[in-house]
Each structure stands twice: as C-alpha cells, then as structure tokens.
C-alpha cells in the first residue's frame, strides 16, 4: 500500500473541487512544500476529499484527480485509457479520421497528460515532471489498451530536461506520412 502525504485545503478550495474545478493553483496550496508526488487531499476539518498530485507546470501546481483513494499504477491508467478509447469509438469507425486526441488531460481524468494519434503512431505529451516520472507506468498501460498502435513518441512540455521529444516504443514512424 502506498502511503501518501496529506494536504489540507481551505473551505474555498473545497468548494472549488466540489464544482469540478480540478486544477490546483498556488493560491490553493498555501504553505505546501511538497512536489512531484501523489497526495491525499483533506478538507479544513480533516475530512477526506480525494487524491491529487502536485507538480509545477505552466498552469498550476497540480491536479485533483479523484474523489476516491486511488494509486496511480498501471491498472488505474488502463481504466482511464479504456474509458477514453470508448468515448472515441466513432473516430475509429471513420475511415477519413486518422488523427485525433486519444486522451485529453483532465477531461479524461488525469491532468498533465495528453496522447494524440497520428495514423498508427501515438504522441504522449508530458506537461510536468511528475507525469514524466511515471511515464513508464503510463506507457505500459497505454500499450495494453491500444495494442494496435505501432509505435509512440513523447513531447516534453515542461522545462528541465535536455531534450524535447523522443521515440518511446515500437516501430519508428516514417519521416512523412499522410493523416
């Protein structure tokens, strides 16, 4: 079992989360010195609100992910990817659609990550260092749910690494192809 640090948020942030606003901003997390990790979110009275992760990115300091106690493991991401795939089933049936977003951050249940499909190849975009840290778990879950994808690449959308894109797994895409 994973032991998570806990953060306590104000009534204002409790209301924000209850409305479904899941981006955690600096003003939401006063006096929190944690970063790049999962956290349990508690209300002002110490009541459990859900699970989030903290990691600096262009917008915000983290994401509230679930009202449940969850662990960001392969099974968790497989579930998210299955739901996302089901939502986009119409795109798979349309022969004229060969490029689309397979997974769209908080809209699919996990802010800080997008996955786009171009033909038979996926592109993961990591928007913060925490998501990048767990990229192997994410990509393995993805491979289980999307075995038809021939290969994948990654785009780094945050500062701190010495590269911006790389091949992740599978076949390499041709230099040029039509989508």
For the regions a protein language model found, what residue spans apply to each?
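Non-catalytic accessory regions of SAM-dependent methyltransferases
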Residues: 1-117, 166-169, 174-176
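Short amphipathic alpha-helical segments
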Residues: 73-80, 130-138
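Non-catalytic substrate-recognition/targeting regions of SAM-dependent transferases
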Residues: 103-110, 114-116, 132-179
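Divalent cation-coordinating acidic motifs and surrounding scaffolds
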Residues: 120
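Structural motif
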Residues: 125-129
């Amino acid at each position: 079992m994973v032991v998570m640090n806990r953060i306590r948020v104000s009534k204002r942030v409790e209301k924000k989360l209850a409305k479904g606003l899941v981006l955690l901003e600096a003003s939401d997390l006063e006096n929190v010195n944690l970063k790049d990790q999962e956290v349990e979110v508690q209300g002002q009275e110490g009541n459990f609100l859900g699970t989030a992760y903290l990691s600096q990115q262009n917008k915000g300091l983290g994401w509230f992910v679930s009202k449940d106690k969850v662990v960001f493991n392969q099974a968790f991401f497989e579930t998210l990817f299955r739901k996302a795939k089901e939502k986009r089933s119409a795109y798979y049936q349309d022969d004229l659609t060969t490029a689309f977003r397979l997974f769209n951050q908080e809209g699919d249940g996990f802010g800080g990550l997008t996955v786009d499909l171009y033909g038979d190849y996926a592109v993961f975009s990591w928007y913060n260092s925490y998501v990048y840290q767990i990229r192997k778990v994410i990509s393995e879950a993805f491979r289980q749910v999307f075995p038809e994808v021939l290969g994948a690449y990654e785009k780094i959308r945050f500062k701190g690494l010495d590269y911006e894109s790389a091949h992740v797994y599978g076949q390499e895409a041709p230099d040029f192809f039509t989508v």
